[in-house]
Amino acid sequence: MKNMRLTVCIGIMCGWLAAGMLHAGTRPDHVRPVEEDGSRLWLPVIRPVEGAEVEITYKGKVSPTIAIAIAELKNAWKGDPVLLEKKKTGRGDGFAITSSEHQVRILSSTETGLLYGAYSLLRMQAAGQLTVPLSVTEQPAYDLRILNHWDNPDGTVERGYAGRSLWNWEELPGTLSPRYEAYARANASVGINGTVLNNVNASPQVLTTGSLEKVKALADVFRPYGIKVYLSVNFASPIQLGKLDTADPLDKEVIGWWKQKVKEIYAMIPDFGGFLVKANSEGQPGPCDFGRTHAEGANMLADALKPYGGIVMWRAFVYSPTDSDRAKQAYLEFMPLDGQFHDNVIVQIKNGPIDFQPREPYSPLFTAMKQTSMMVEFQITQEYLGFSNHLAYLAPLWEEFFGEVRPDRLKAVA
């Protein structure tokens, strides 16, 4: 039986944490704040007085990720000297923070974990939660912590109520907005490690060489912050881009087209995460158009990605406008396929059986499918909760979901 995996697709809500910067240890206050416009969220920049810079040490080659961790601490940490050290502290990007009389140590087996530890230390400082001595251990509950953006190539955002897209595709790859690094920084500060850049109602054009060069430019900015990029893809891309007569997932030419396209992507972006697919839903093309199942469509893409370590996130949000009971359709289509999906396929299921309603039970697929890796899709944009006119606190909804879907059956969260 395959392990069930759950990845919660969530977004970051911008806001400010109003908290005074407090001392840790005995180091005097030799820093002054830099003027802020709010874009740095809870992560202020503190300008040290000349000659008063805190000592941050890392034993080893300083990579771009380590350089960021050191810079963040030098910008804002007001306590004792800090030692960053690569050391096994548990699974994945977990980390530990300890302190002795005159030193703070941040330990992790990965460079990204050390960056997370640096942000955790600064967060505790900002919130006034530092203790003496420090003894903090954090392990990621889920390996995949991904944001899904519904951004379109023209700069619009489907179900977007907070302005236009972050990505300026017309200027990429030549011009990199400082907002891209600010985005990566904010995500890394709370442990987000993946982003799907484009709308699930995807245009085949995202897979053209010119578009992939733009995606590469973003991936290069995000990489030092431990963030992989993913793309939503249109299942009929071999027809529109490859000029094939079919997108049948069992057709040899179609299989070859996807393998070649994946090879092209990984030549540009070696750590590319994989594909998100909306198929046979709301008019989007999919394997059912060719008499194939969702599993056959997903597995074909998974086979193309597997040599490079990529995954397929295959959405279970499917319904026919002619059926009067939408709540049952995902179950009826996917439950018979339990156990047929390849290991690097994750079925992405909305938290409820309808469509992001303010109140609805959890999808029965989460407890019914025993042999399939799954991920939950939450909606942060307030499509049903007031658009941009209201601010709704969503954490109780997520907490309720995890109270019903047992955490010990889940593998990942985002």
Which sequence ranges carry the predicted segments?
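Bacterial N-terminal signal peptides that target proteins for export
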Residues: 1-11
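Bacterial N-terminal signal peptides
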Residues: 9-20
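Acidic, contiguous N-terminal accessory segments
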Residues: 24-104, 109-112, 131-133
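A generic structural motif
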Residues: 25, 77-89, 132-138, 277, ...
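Hydrophobic beta-strand segments of well-ordered beta-sheets in folded domains
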Residues: 51-57, 81, 145-147, 193-195, ...
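A generic structural signal for short coil/turn motifs at secondary-structure boundaries
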Residues: 61-64, 106, 204-207, 284-289
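Feature activates predominantly on carbohydrate-active enzymes
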Residues: 69-72, 90-94, 99-276, 306, ...
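Catalytic-core regions of glycoside hydrolase
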Residues: 243-414
